UniProtKB/Swiss-Prot annotation:
This is UDP-N-acetylmuramate--L-alanine ligase. Belongs to the MurCDEF family. It comes from Neisseria gonorrhoeae (strain ATCC 700825 / FA 1090). Cell wall formation. The gene is murC. ATP binds at residues 113-119. Keywords: ATP-binding, Cell cycle, Cell division, Cell shape, Cell wall biogenesis/degradation, Cytoplasm, Ligase, Nucleotide-binding, Peptidoglycan synthesis. One of its GO terms (biological process) is cell division. One of its GO terms (molecular function) is ATP binding. Pathway: Cell wall biogenesis; peptidoglycan biosynthesis.
Length: 469
């Protein structure tokens, strides 16, 4: 067991959302945890408050005494801490391998898929908590009810996201897995081959033991395509009545979704029950169905499922409502923040906003994430961005990439302008975006701040400007 051989664990890039969660759980398990990061953020401050040593910047001395070094995927091989660890024959492992080790301490439930992982993981943790199962969880966003993205529970289960972006989910050995959907994203990891992408998800499902169970969303075309090749036990879920778990009578009730769940899963009591999900969007109905499937498999009651969904307080940056902000013109606008950065998830979130606030003007502030994604999905981006009532685009968040010709926000603005419906506003510097939005917004608007990069700082800046009015 790792606990007999490893005492000191050092994280390089500990401030990342996936890294910080694992570090916190290991700390609470009794390991001595340290870490380093170039920049302080809310995650590093939280870890420091727990007594974890977090170093600013990277130097070789930081790995002194470490038994193992966990490196974020964003950390390069030339990092002085990685170099020093290798020179001293200290194992250097990716985040997913350490997550796999955590699954040796608990029964693992791994949530994979191109979109919806964070929400589905959070909903699963919420229901298992309501069922009294006290799960451990590691989530790619802050669970609002817990105030953190990770927690060590006393129960037998660990619920965690499984990251397909770098194929690291193939390190995991869960007893249950979920595939929310499969889309053509991070295709450089798979040699731009859909067949290799499909095979990776099949291999992920097959990481389960023979007694495991997968929950697969048949509303996803790519998931349907892999079903004939899946040899481990699985159940399907979706909006079609051929699925083992499906939903009908879906209704928007303000910012909630009310629907009927039908269960025709082998080995389970057949029947139906009503639930209210405390978040908007048909895509979140699918995410809830996945969580319901897992919950039923571990023995949670219908009452616990209903309680966990109705009492769900959301997760950071997933349709996160900040409330009304004051505007210079004397009115107010509702501020919502979201991590969406792929056209498919953006379309789902925008549809959720329309469903929740059908009478309001929808203003979108968007920062594209990566030039390559903008290039590869350029037409899809122009289509989805053209569905809002007003649009402010800030420049692409590079995420370490070099600029790509005709794949920036200016190019997107030009393409949308040609379609004739919108006159996009271009804001080159994201730091200028809050003030620009204050000038654009009208009384009664819903402003959706969206993107996976530095645009995450905009809500706090808008709230600060609102206080000054």
């Amino acid at each position: 067991m790792m606990k007999n051989r490893v005492s000191n664990i050092h994280f390089v890039g500990i401030g990342g959302v996936g890294m910080s969660g694992i570090a916190e759980v290991l700390h609470n398990l009794g390991f001595k945890v340290s870490g380093s990061d170039q920049a302080r953020n809310a995650a590093t401050e939280h870890l420091s408050s727990l007594g974890i040593q977090v170093y600013p910047g990277h130097t070789a001395e930081h790995v002194n005494g470490a038994d193992v070094v966990v490196a974020s995927t964003a950390v390069k091989k030339e990092n002085p801490e990685v170099v020093a660890a290798l020179e001293r024959q200290i194992p250097v492992i990716p985040r997913a391998l350490m997550l796999a080790e955590l699954m040796r301490f608990r029964d693992g439930i791994a949530i994979a898929g191109t979109h919806g992982k964070t929400t589905t993981t959070s909903l699963t943790a919420s229901i298992l908590g309501a069922a009294g199962l006290d799960p451990t969880f590691v989530i790619g966003g802050k669970l609002n009810a817990a105030g953190t993205n990770a927690r060590l529970g006393k129960g037998e289960y660990i619920v965690a996201e499984a990251d397909e972006s770098d194929a690291s989910f193939l390190h995991l050995t869960p007893i249950m897995s979920v595939v929310t959907n499969i889309d053509e994203d991070h295709m450089d990891t798979y040699g731009h081959s859909v067949e290799k992408l499909h095979q990776a998800f099949i291999d992920f499902i097959h990481r389960m033991p023979f007694y495991g169970k997968a929950f697969l969303c048949v509303d996803s075309e790519h998931v349907r395509a892999i079903l004939p090749k899946v040899s481990k036990p699985y159940a399907t879920y979706g909006l079609d009545d051929t699925a083992d778990i499906y939903a009908t009578d879906i209704e928007n009730v303000g910012a909630q979704m009310k629907f009927t769940v039908h269960v025709q899963m082998k080995g389970h009591e057949q029947g139906s029950f009503e639930v209210v999900l405390n978040m908007p969007g048909r895509h979140n109905v699918l995410n809830a169905l996945a969580a319901i499937g897992v919950a039923l498999e571990v023995g949670a009651s219908v009452e616990a499922i209903q309680k966990g969904l109705l009492g769900f307080e959301g997760v950071g940056r997933r349709f996160q409502k900040y409330g009304d902000i004051k505007l210079p013109n004397g009115g107010t606008a509702l501020l919502v923040d979201d991590y969406g950065h792929h056209p498919v998830e953006m379309a789902a979130t925008l549809a959720a906003a329309r469903g929740a606030y059908p009478e309001k003007r929808l203003v979108l502030a968007f920062q594209p994430h990566r030039y390559t994604r903008t290039r590869d999905l350029f037409e899809d981006f122009t289509k989805v961005l053209n569905t809002v009532d007003a649009l402010v685009l800030t420049e692409v968040y590079a995420a370490g990439e070099e600029p790509v010709a005709a794949a920036d926000s200016r190019a997107l603005a030009r393409a949308i302008r040609v379609l004739g419906k919108l006159e996009p506003i271009y804001c080159e510097n994201v730091a200028d975006l809050p003030q620009m939005l204050m000038n654009v917004l009208q009384d009664g608007d819903v402003v959706l701040n969206m993107g996976a990069g530095s645009i995450n700082r905009v809500p706090s800046a808008l709230l600060e400007l609102s206080k000054q009015i």
